[in-house]
A protein has these predicted regions:
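PLP-dependent aminotransferase-like
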Residues: 50-130, 134-139
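N-terminal "arm"/small-domain region of PLP-dependent enzymes with the aminotransferase-like
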Residues: 1-12, 205-207, 323
């Protein structure tokens, strides 16, 4: 198997030659100077925020409608998540909502590129920069989607169901050489020397805080093979999303969450009335629908930072994720759309 041959060249499962090659290939694909591979997007968000100086006494502006993995790094760093509402049509934050949420304690903005949709904060980027507020993009669902050009640390996920998979893993796109160096050090427990260098010496230096966050060569090998075929996967995902959108375009009561024309979609999410009932009917029929995600500001772990977010709370009762993966066909999407409409039309009781 090609992944196995790639991984074997490194001679070990930990980070090494193959991970470094994967980083260079990612940088070339994304057309950026450097990419720092990490063990997960959650680790990537943690390290990116840490690099920006997020810690006790600081706040991070973040949407509530996201996976808990976006929020936990903020809390782990001792900072405060300042939850904000999103646009009901995209489930992404907008510049004006970010601007209104800024306080003297704000150190970073963490937009979530929901479903693969880019979040454009260009209109406030200059204001944020002048206030020393950093942008860290949670692009866990957005590999392959266009980048907006705003100076941001961008974090990708290479989990098993993502557009690009390494089975597990992620990557951070740094803005500067200094950030790249800081990220590489902090992903290695704050140790300044590489593992290869350490086995040749009797000591090493721990320069600062860090996590065990390196991407293994085994996972990097999988990622390299998947990157080589990514354009094919991207086409399949766009075709599948468009098939859903076409099938549901004129359906009464259904709103398809828009990911934008150029995105590589991660999923297809709709808003429907009576979501819980529809969800149950479709699950009973064997259709793998889901909900992504319950709002974080209503979770017990984050209750101390809850705020009134009426849009988030309304859409949270309506969103439904339809089955979505590149092994599906457009026929599958049309069948699922028809099943959704049948479930919605079924009388209650």
């Amino acid at each position: 198997m090609l992944e196995e041959r790639h991984g074997a060249t490194a001679g070990r499962a930990s980070a090494g030659l193959v991970a470094a090659l994967f980083e260079r290939e990612l940088a070339s694909y994304l057309r950026v100077p450097d990419v720092v591979a990490v063990s997960s997007a959650t680790v990537g968000i943690h390290l990116a925020l840490q690099t920006c100086g997020v810690g006790p006494g600081t706040e991070v502006i973040v949407p509530s409608q996201t996976f808990a993995a976006t929020i936990q790094p903020i809390v782990a760093l001792g900072a405060v998540p300042r939850f904000i509402d999103h646009s009901p049509g995209t489930l992404c934050v907008e510049a004006e909502a970010v601007k209104e949420a800024i306080t003297p304690a704000t150190r970073a903005v963490l937009p979530v590129l929901y479903g693969g949709r880019p979040v454009d904060l260009t209109s406030i980027a200059s204001d944020l920069r002048h206030q020393n507020i950093h942008i860290v993009e949670d692009a866990a669902q957005a590999f392959g989607s266009p980048r907006t050009g705003v100076q941001a640390l961008t974090v990708y996920s290479f989990g098993p169901i993502k557009q690009l998979t390494a089975l597990v893993g992620g990557a951070v796109v740094p803005r500067t050489v200094e950030e790249a160096e800081a990220l590489r050090q902090s992903r290695s427990l704050g140790i300044t020397s590489s593992q290869t260098d350490r086995i040749r010496t009797t000591t090493y230096c721990v320069q600062g805080p860090g996590l065990r966050g390196v991407l293994s060569d085994v996972n990097a090998a999988v990622g390299r093979v998947q990157l080589a075929r990514f354009e094919t996967v991207a086409v399949l995902r766009r075709e599948l999303w468009n098939a859903y959108a076409q099938a549901l375009r004129d359906a009464p009561g259904v709103a398809v969450i828009d990911v934008g024309n150029d995105a590589v979609p991660f999923n297809c999410v709709v808003r429907v009335p009576g979501r819980n009932r529809v969800h149950g009917i479709m699950r009973d029929r064997g259709v793998g629908v889901g909900v992504h995600y319950p709002p974080n500001h209503l979770q017990p772990a984050f209750a101390r930072w809850t705020r009134s977010l009426p849009i988030t709370e309304r859409t949270a009762e309506e969103i439904l994720s339809l089955p979505f993966h590149p092994a599906m066909t457009c026929h599958d999407a049309r069948w699922t759309a028809a099943a959704l409409l049948e479930a919605m039309a079924r009388p209650p009781g």
